[in-house]
């Protein structure tokens, strides 16, 4: 069903790096990192432009197509193999390693497990489940964990806002935004440039180097296009189908799932980023020590 596809795309994108990294960035830089989560509209390009293309090749080649398969078909065997190698190396260095690291930190803080036990255990358990359960198992787990993740994260957000506002969520929101506006991102000139907005336009703004005006949105769009429309980790969740299923049925389901995933993609701003900002505001009031912003979501 389309809602399973939407949940699977969303769950494929969410990992421990969001719980640790996105919340930590929120505690340090406010909503500057939210521009990555605003790229959900790219998933619509996957559903409307790329799924028909992939499905056409599926019918022609008789199997689920990956981008390396397409390059082998369109150009040469070597071209597709090189993309596979580059993608594998990139995933190990930028995705798997980061997920293992942040997962180890989170489990160490939450359960008291030694860092390496948590990091390696996370990789081993994920591998076992994927090998034994296959794509069907992954999709089923995604459908189960997505609502749990959303409900649990919003519960953390509301409890944090209530703690900040002395029992009032609305007061907590006001205090959090005021802290982001006046106490975060203070320049060398003593001026508070604020961390309650995504774009930083002036070079005197300390966060300009990390979030240089509108260019950061352009850069995120280019990377988002690659990730959401060509990355096999995402694409394979859209193209799941029964043997002999009609093209229009596959594409209609994929497009509906893409729409659902696009809406889901906005949620991490509220699920992870803003709880980090709440943690920073609570730490400023002396509620706890947060010298390590990576622990923002856990605390």
Regions found by a protein language model. Give the residues of each.
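Membrane-interface helix-loop-helix modules in multi-pass membrane proteins
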Residues: 2-63, 208-227, 231-239, 244-287, ...
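Interfacial loop/helix-cap signal at membrane boundaries in integral membrane proteins
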Residues: 3, 7, 182-208, 292-298
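Small-residue-rich segments of transmembrane alpha-helices in multi-pass membrane proteins
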Residues: 3-8, 73-77, 81, 145-159
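Transmembrane alpha-helical core residues of multi-pass small-molecule transporters
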Residues: 11, 39-43, 87, 122-125, ...
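Helix-loop-helix module between adjacent transmembrane segments
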Residues: 34-131, 219-227
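Hydrophobic alpha-helical segments and their helix-loop junctions in multi-pass secondary transporters
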Residues: 51, 92, 96, 100, ...
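Helix-boundary and loop/linker segments of multi-pass membrane transporters
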Residues: 72-77, 112, 202-210, 247-250, ...
């Amino acid at each position: 069903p389309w809602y399973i596809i939407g949940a699977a795309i969303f769950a494929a994108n969410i990992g421990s790096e969001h719980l640790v990294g996105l919340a930590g960035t929120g505690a340090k830089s406010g909503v500057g990192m939210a521009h990555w989560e605003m790229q959900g509209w790219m998933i619509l390009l996957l559903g409307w432009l790329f799924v028909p293309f992939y499905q056409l090749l599926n019918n022609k080649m008789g199997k689920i197509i990956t981008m390396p398969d397409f390059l082998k078909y369109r150009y040469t065997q070597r071209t597709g193999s090189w993309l596979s190698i580059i993608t594998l190396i990139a995933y190990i260095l930028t995705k798997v390693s980061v997920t293992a690291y942040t997962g180890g930190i989170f489990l160490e803080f939450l359960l008291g497990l030694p860092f390496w036990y948590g990091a390696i255990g996370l990789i081993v358990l994920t591998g076992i489940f994927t090998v034994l359960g296959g794509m069907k198992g992954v999709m089923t787990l995604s459908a189960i964990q997505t609502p749990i993740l959303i409900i649990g994260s919003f519960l953390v957000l509301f409890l944090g806002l209530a703690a900040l506002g002395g029992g009032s969520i609305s007061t907590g929101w006001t205090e959090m935004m005021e802290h982001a506006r006046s106490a975060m991102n203070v320049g060398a000139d003593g001026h508070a440039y604020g961390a309650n907005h995504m774009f930083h336009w002036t070079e005197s703004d300390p966060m300009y180097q990390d979030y240089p005006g509108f260019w950061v949105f352009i850069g995120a769009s280019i990377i988002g296009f690659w990730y959401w429309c060509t990355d096999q980790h995402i694409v394979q969740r859209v193209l799941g189908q029964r043997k002999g299923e009609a093209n229009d049925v596959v594409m209609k389901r994929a497009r509906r799932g893409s729409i659902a995933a696009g809406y889901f993609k906005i949620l991490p701003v509220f699920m992870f980023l803003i709880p980090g900002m709440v943690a920073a505001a609570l730490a400023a009031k002396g509620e706890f020590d947060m010298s390590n912003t990576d622990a923002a979501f856990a605390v």
